[in-house]
């Protein structure tokens, strides 16, 4: 990944942080943004993803957001896909998605909770995933579950497991991120 792209991603993350801090009042609702890194593995593809999301938290339990990011798919295991030639190198892709998260707060400490969520969107690849095919748009549905731990006022850390469905590289992985 080029230096210019890294600078753009960091700039977007800082902008989202400042925007959500300026829009949020004292209540636990309003605009919220997050930056998340995930690592996913399927039987035949490994991928890494860095995404940023901006959305609205309706209350302490429900969040709906719109996000985008960048991801990298590594080559796949040809033994599991015998009809396709081996791809080497990295495929760059750019996911755009709608994100919904439902938090279940712990009874003793309402600031921390268990989260369930889903993300539906489309991923655009800079070249076809498989050499024998010509599509570059790949719909995806990502299911996630994990924990949301408040560190300070509205700043928190989220982490957990995710599973891809409805996309070519189906698989499971983990995610970690910050929300503010």
Please annotate each region the language model reported.
Residues 1-29:
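Cleavable N-terminal export/targeting peptides
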Residues 25-41:
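Short N-terminal segments immediately surrounding and downstream of signal-peptide cleavage
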Residues 32, 47-49, 93-97, 138-142, ...:
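Transmembrane beta-barrel architecture of outer-membrane proteins
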Residues 37-41, 53-131, 138, 149-155, ...:
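Gram-negative (and chloroplast) outer-membrane scaffold detector with strong preference
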Residues 145-147:
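Surface-exposed extracellular loop regions of Gram-negative outer-membrane beta-barrel proteins
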Residues 161-168:
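Short, exposed beta-strand-loop hairpins at the edges of beta-sheets
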Residues 169-180:
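Outer-membrane beta-barrel "beta-signal"
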């Amino acid at each position: 990944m080029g230096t210019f792209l890294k600078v753009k991603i960091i700039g977007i993350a800082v902008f989202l942080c400042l925007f959500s801090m300026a829009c949020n009042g004292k209540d636990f609702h309003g605009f919220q943004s997050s930056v998340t890194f995930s690592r996913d593995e399927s039987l035949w593809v490994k991928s890494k993803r860095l995404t940023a999301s901006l959305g609205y938290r309706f209350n302490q339990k429900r969040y709906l957001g719109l996000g985008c990011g960048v991801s990298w798919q590594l080559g796949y295991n040809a033994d599991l896909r015998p009809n396709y030639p081996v791809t080497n190198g990295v495929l760059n892709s750019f996911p755009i998605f709608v994100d919904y998260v439902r938090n279940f707060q712990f009874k003793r400490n309402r600031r921390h909770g268990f989260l369930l969520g889903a993300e539906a969107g489309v991923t655009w690849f800079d070249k076809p995933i498989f050499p024998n095919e010509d599509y570059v748009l790949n719909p995806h549905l990502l299911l996630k579950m994990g924990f949301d731990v408040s560190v300070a006022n509205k700043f928190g850390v989220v982490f957990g497991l995710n599973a891809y469905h409805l996309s070519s590289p189906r698989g499971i992985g983990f995610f970690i991120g910050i929300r503010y």
